[in-house]
Amino acid sequence: MDIVLEICDYYLFDKVYADVFPKDGAVHEFLKPAIQSFSQIDFPSLPNLDSFDTNSTLISSNNFNISNVNPATIPSYLFSKIASYQDKSEIYGLAPKFFPATDFINTSFLARSNIFRETLSLFIITTIFGWLLYFIVAYLSYVFVFDKKIFNHPRYLKNQMSLEIKRATTAIPVMVLLTIPFFLLELNGYSFLYLDINECTGGYKAILWQIPKFILFTDCGIYFLHRWLHWPSVYKVLHKPHHKWIVCTPFASHAFHPVDGFFQSLPYHLYPLLFPLHKVLYLFLFTFVNFWTVMIHDGSYWSNDPVVNGTACHTVHHLYFNYNYGQFTTLWDRLGNSYRRPDDSLFVKDVKAEEEKKIWKEQTRKMEEIRGEVEGKVDDREYVEQ
């Protein structure tokens, strides 16, 4: 995110923060006592890990024995451990990397590297970008791809699209807020994100290899998180709002409970904390993920690929609840015995109206059986056909 944040700081935020939060301005004077009090807090020091005497302070290299623990040194040890993972050259805001310094770079008491400024900037940028990406991609899919015959499906809801949009637009800012800590870790050097492409970083071959690694890692993570979200106690609280949509439009793609959306995004944020990932590819993959999320909700069935977890597979998940939890592939569903092959009827084009009604009626019958098992007898949805 440092690339995006520096672009925004250079073209907009440096001046905005200088105007709204100037040094020695009213806000600064008001906050000075709190800032001074905060700066006087005696935080644990960050000792050099290489010189840390683990034998005499916290833990023996061979044993963990309570007699070896000195409680006073635990905070210092933990802080030093955390600090050892930090790449200080990647800390954002200490010096410009991609653009020259602006005239306003040092005129706000909230410097570029200030964690409160980073949090506010990230929230604004990511929320606006999330809304734009959601509306643009979902709208284009709705206009050019989405099969609007789905409006006649007996399990399409009253005012469904407006409900989907309302749910998504209110969820996105909360999902952003929940994921900001991961962006802050990246901005402060606690990730394996990098920019230079050379022999030391593996060159372009490494970048090409990162794409399938990212897909496979996140596909695995989302599968298990998604299955957990279908545990009855968790489903009722978090995941049921997304299953309100039995048949979907592209606008259902981000219509989650925000905590549900946060959990399903965790693998995307964990990957760069664990594995090397090029910064530009990182931005591309996050954009791709949003495209994919819209695509699997667009109701257009182009392929019945046995490997790719496409639109048809995800339609089966919304119709029949307990199948096809994967995001990109069918691998983990096959291994976890939760794969359900999409019905051939989904791929038949130019179906006559009467035949389509029979197909939908059979879908509804099967769906109601499983829905009753998952949610109970009471269905609080309001369908068009009621």
Swiss-Prot record:
Cofactor(s) required, per the database record: Fe cation
Motif Histidine box-1: where in chain: 226-230
Subcellular location: Endoplasmic reticulum membrane
TM stretches of this protein: 120-140, 172-192, 206-226, 272-292
Pfam short name (any one): FA_hydroxylase
Domain notes: The histidine box domains may contain the active site and/or be involved in metal ion binding.
InterPro entries assigned: Fatty_acid_hydroxylase (IPR006694), Sterol_Desaturase_Related (IPR050307)
GO CC annotation: endoplasmic reticulum lumen; endoplasmic reticulum membrane
Motif extent (Histidine box-3): 314-318
Its EC number(s): 1.14.19.20
Function: The third module or late pathway involves the ergosterol synthesis itself through consecutive reactions that mainly occur in the endoplasmic reticulum (ER) membrane. Firstly, the squalene synthase ERG9 catalyzes the condensation of 2 farnesyl pyrophosphate moieties to form squalene, which is the precursor of all steroids.
One GO molecular-function entry: iron ion binding
Extent of motif Histidine box-2: 239-243
Name of the molecule in the record: Delta(7)-sterol 5(6)-desaturase
An annotated GO BP: ergosterol biosynthetic process
